[in-house]
Amino acid sequence: MPKPTPPFNNHRRHTLRLAAGSAAALLLPVGRTASAQVPPMPKSAVTINVVDVAGNLALTQDAIEAYQKAHAQWVSKFNFTKMPAPELPGKLKAMQAAGRTDIDMVLTGTDFLAAGIEQGELTQLMPAFASKFPNLMANYQPAAAKMQELAGDYGIEVTFMPAGPLLEYNPDKVTDVPTTPQELLAWCKAHPNRFIYARPANSGPGRTFLMGLPYLLGDKDPKDPVHGWDKTWAYLKELGAYVEYYPTGTGAVMKELGEGSRDMTPTVTGWDLNPRALGIVPKSFKVAPFQHMTWVNDAHYMVIPKGVAPEKIAVVLDLMAYLLTPHAQAYTYDQGYFYPGPAVKGVTLAMAPAKSQESVKEYGRPEYDKWLGEFPHTQSLPPKSQVEAFRIWDQQVGAQKTK
């Protein structure tokens, strides 16, 4: 590993110093193309359109904008758009059918990653562009490297979160905190409509809850939602009788939790920390693990749709390489949105902007370290299985109650 970049002392929007030394030790120096397979950089500056379907810009936008300032000869500006993950496959399909892809890079969770691979909408990055990412797997944290494997040859992991599932609750309303799925069901029966979670196809906490239940319930095959999740599907259908509706995203869940219209929800490390740091959920709200839980890890990825012009691919690949340098990775601590955030080894909280350090210290939970060491970890479902799990949930669990 390279010598760590000195700690940040400035506001997170201060322009990043694109230190060639730190970049070179981890990846190729920004701007260098090491193979004829990698397209040449553009002769004049281009505009790059970035779509975020994961909330990842909270973690990476500062670094992306700093890249533009340092490389105005290649990129004149970045346009940023946010949309729900389930809407993007149809949008890309229409663009690609018309022969005009106006989206140059997507920042995504495992949801669109899975759908994009399944529907053949993504550019294969490896092995053609491997020269831009030397030692890629070795530079990831071990658990993050496992999540990179899910991307196959189509995505580059940029941020990592151990995730959950955990239960977040209002301690003034929930005094008998459930520690098993059975206890959660009993609580929901006694307190109908006070528990809520969002549609898994567009919610990190929702899909982590979905993918964590097979381990908690002792299902036949936690990696096979079609043939191995009999207990999970039966449980979710029964639980659904006491859930008023399923929001289409996690933001609505946290708003209702904070306003007091719900008392408990499944969560993950980042969605516990960040809404409290932002004042959406009271700081006093608590989280609890399930007994004998398995952590289902999560990640965000950078992908390139099919149909992007070669000169734009060159810029996006160079940006991706930069976003994996320790200096840029330190920004991903943010205010805990994807806690901790960095996917790359050796990126400590002391290297993050002061605001990030303050938020994590004030709103983080010391018990996380204990739980992360106490319980085993696994990865999110592989892309094809994840698509199947979302389809079954939509049809059998959420069909009448998602809005």
List the predicted regions and their residue ranges.
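Mature extracytoplasmic/periplasmic domains
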Residues: 302-370
